[in-house]
Amino acid sequence: MSKNKLSKGQQRRVNANHQRRLKTSKEKPDYDDNLFGEPDEGIVISRFGMHADVESADGDVHRCNIRRTIRSLVTGDRVVWRPGKPAAEGVNVKGIVEAVHERTSVLTRPDFYDGVKPIAANIDQIVIVSAILPELSLNIIDRYLVACETLQIEPIIVLNKIDLLDDEGMKFVNEQMDIYRNIGYRVLMVSSHTQDGLKPLEEALTGRISIFAGQSGVGKSSLLNALLGLQKEILTNDVSDNSGLGQHTTTAARLYHFPHGGDVIDSPGVREFGLWHLEPEQITQGFVEFHDYLGLCKYRDCKHDTDPGCAIREAVEEGKIAETRFENYHRILESMAQVKTRKNFSDTDD
């Protein structure tokens, strides 16, 4: 990170926000301000309960407490933090997070008990990793794409393990990927084993904060290892830093820096995006090629299934919309209805 001290105006706003929150809280201040130095900017590279690892402008990592006035803090957040003074070493903290800058984006996932939970912030793009083995699933890709469209975060589709394809297999896979290329999505074909195709992927990741999504077995960790230049497997629950704080077991998201530039957040929370909390209209909007036909159906309440005069079905029959995408659209709606039914049944049992 480049060194970027707070301006006087930013400092005044941070102080004003902090004081206002303290006044509206019935709790006393949680830490003595005299224990900490001047405010600086940083980025959260991981979060553990009421602690966070914050990377400062000079690249050092500091274990920090979090003010109770901060309601939400996740990996990727840009923050204002203060280092602990030398006299404060006895309290076993390196600093304290004082405030969180406004997010440009937030990656969330639904939770049956806690509603929609944020898991990472300021994401520029989501890299959807799929593979020909154990099975190339366009349905899973389509689910990820709906989530990306709903979150308004740019997706990139990466097909891994292409070294396992013969000429005929490569032709078939390219035909499948053309479905996505033809509707404007970027598709990259790579092999983490032979490193074929990694250069274009590196270029796509440079200067951006990305998060990788993919089911087990698609080689997501191997791909990250190759991009990060690591000799050992990434373990999301193996966290360490250069501040002498040792190892910590966690299931938290973690931010890493690519040697070629750019950052990646590795998180166990994005193996699969749940869509059950969305409305059917949001799923429909998540299929970008449907947009030109919405509002053209004969009936306003058209379900885009067997309804007469459905403009979307007519587009499928005319080859303007891929049939596999249309089928996956209905599979997603059916799976959503099933999950919501189970959730409602569970709620009535409580």
UniProtKB/Swiss-Prot annotation:
Polar residues bias (residue ranges): 1-17
Binding site for Zn(2+): 297, 302, 304, 310
Ion transport keyword on record: no
Cofactor(s) required for function per UniProt: Zn(2+)
Broad enzyme group: hydrolase
Keywords: Cytoplasm, GTP-binding, Hydrolase, Metal-binding, Nucleotide-binding, Ribosome biogenesis, RNA-binding, rRNA-binding, Zinc
Region (Disordered): 1-33
Matches recorded under InterPro entries: G_CP_dom, NA-bd_OB-fold, P-loop_NTPase, Ribosome_biogen_GTPase_RsgA, RsgA_GTPase_dom
GTP-binding listed as a keyword: yes
Boundaries of every CP-type G domain copy: 104-273
GO biological process: ribosomal small subunit biogenesis
Annotated cofactor note: Binds 1 zinc ion per subunit.
UniProt-recorded Gene Ontology molecular function terms: GTP binding; GTPase activity; metal ion binding; rRNA binding
Subunit structure: Monomer. Associates with 30S ribosomal subunit, binds 16S rRNA.
Official protein name in the record: Small ribosomal subunit biogenesis GTPase RsgA
Organism: Escherichia coli (strain SMS-3-5 / SECEC)
Organism taxonomic ancestry: Bacteria, Pseudomonadati, Pseudomonadota, Gammaproteobacteria, Enterobacterales
Gene, per the UniProt record: rsgA
